[in-house]
From Swiss-Prot:
This is Nucleoside diphosphate kinase. GO terms for molecular function: ATP binding; metal ion binding; nucleoside diphosphate kinase activity. It is an enzyme of class 2 (transferase). Transmembrane segments: none annotated. The keyword Heme does not apply. It comes from Methylobacterium nodulans (strain LMG 21967 / CNCM I-2342 / ORS 2060). It holds the Pfam family NDK.
Length: 140
């Protein structure tokens, strides 16, 4: 199995409830290492660029507003099959459908306020990581 990296965001609904430590514990218990982490306030420009793939979707404006409404924690996670592993650990987008023990089942408030983002592919992880971190910021 290949060691790879994925990108994670702890969203404003999670940071507002001081869940960074609790979510990090779930991530680490799953065997993923947090090799870079930064708490930031995402600008509107950053959010629009990051979620550009959703620009034509009806929820785009609301998503950008939500992601800029408070601090977020951006992270690089590393481990065997990190992208798939983290998606499993996050759980379904809708917390009502998420498996027991997943981040979204434990912490998400709703489909929109679902506490975390994770890359959907290794290729997208590289692009997303590069938007927030230089290679020198990632320490494994």
């Amino acid at each position: 199995m290949a060691i790879e990296r994925t990108f994670s965001i702890l969203k404003p609904d999670a940071t507002a409830r001081n869940l960074t430590g609790a979510i990090n514990a779930v991530i680490e218990e799953a065997g993923l290492r947090i090799v870079a982490q930064r708490r930031i306030r995402m600008s509107e420009a950053q959010a629009k660029t990051f979620y550009e793939v959703h620009a034509e979707r009806p929820f785009y404006g609301e998503l950008v507003s939500f992601m800029t409404s408070g601090p977020v924690v951006v992270q690089v996670l590393e481990g065997e099959n990190a992208v798939a592993k983290y998606r499993e650990v996050m759980g379904a987008t809708n917390p009502a459908q998420a498996a027991e023990g997943t981040i979204r089942k434990k912490f998400a408030l709703s489909v929109g306020e679902n506490s975390v983002h994770g890359s959907d592919s290794a290729e997208n992880a590289k692009v997303e990581i590069a938007q927030f971190f230089d290679e020198k910021d990632i320490v494994g």
